[in-house]
């Protein structure tokens, strides 16, 4: 859930930044940030672990040289590493949903916020985010489900004794314990139905208006 929440928050800032600064460099930066969804989870995991491992080695070398101690793994094999990979992997999903919500907010709302003396950050917090509650919730649920069923990146980056439903299902199924794996597999399926039900209700309410 934390990874999904961080992904939505980053998407809000990127989407709003693109809205108020529609420059070519900003647009390219946003599109580059959302390229992770087109890459396999394994590729992203390797792309995360290489710089993190390099950083850990450098810090360990410095600690050994100056203090005679080993710092161990600071980033590699931590919850931070796996959350970072999740955000890179699924940022495009939340960004697309947030941008869709921002397109529904008329530019006159930005003009009204500026006329009231709101700075861009204040306009985002007091005007746009309240209007983006539905889009943000949709993005949160979709990314949460995607994170829940992500397997390759989780297997490579997860800390010791850290399991997700996808990993648990994979381990039990690999051991031919199909009956035991069905519980966690069913939980993933049921979680995947939540955004579908929510979106169906939202669409129905929109049509009735």
Show which residues each predicted segment covers.
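Interhelical loop and adjacent transmembrane-helix boundary motif
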Residues: 148, 154-197
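Cytoplasmic-entry segments and transmembrane alpha-helices of multi-pass inner-membrane transporters
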Residues: 13-48
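Transmembrane alpha-helix signature in integral membrane proteins
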Residues: 1-18
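C-terminal transmembrane helix and the adjacent membrane-cytosol boundary/short C-terminal tail
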Residues: 17-18, 25, 99-110, 114, ...
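Membrane-cytosol interface at the C-terminal ends of specific transmembrane alpha-helices
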Residues: 75-114, 139-140
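Transmembrane alpha-helices
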Residues: 35, 39, 88, 95-98, ...
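Membrane-interfacial helix termini and adjacent extracytoplasmic/periplasmic loops
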Residues: 25-29, 45-87, 121, 157-160
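A structural signal for multi-pass alpha-helical bundles of membrane permease subunits
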Residues: 45-58, 85-88, 97-100, 139-149, ...
């Amino acid at each position: 859930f934390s990874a999904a929440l961080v992904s939505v928050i980053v998407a809000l800032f990127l989407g709003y930044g693109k809205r108020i600064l529609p420059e070519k460099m900003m647009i390219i930066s946003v599109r580059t940030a959302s390229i992770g969804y087109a890459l396999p989870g394994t590729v992203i995991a390797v792309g995360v672990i290489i710089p993190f491992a390099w950083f850990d080695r450098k810090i360990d070398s410095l600690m050994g040289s100056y203090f005679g101690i080993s710092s161990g793994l600071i980033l590699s094999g931590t919850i931070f590493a796996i959350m970072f990979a999740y955000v890179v992997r699924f940022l495009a999903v939340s960004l697309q949903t947030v941008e869709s919500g921002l397109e529904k907010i008329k530019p006159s709302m930005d003009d009204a916020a500026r006329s009231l003396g709101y700075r861009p950050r204040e306009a985002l917090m007091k005007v746009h985010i309240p209007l983006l509650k539905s889009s943000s919730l949709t993005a949160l649920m979709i990314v949460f489900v995607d994170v829940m069923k992500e397997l390759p990146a989780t297997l490579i980056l997860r800390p010791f004794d850290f399991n997700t439903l996808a990993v648990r299902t994979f381990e039990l199924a690999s051991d031919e314990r199909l009956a035991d794996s069905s519980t966690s597999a069913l939980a993933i399926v049921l979680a995947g139905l939540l955004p579908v039900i929510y979106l169906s209700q939202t669409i129905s309410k929109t049509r009735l208006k």
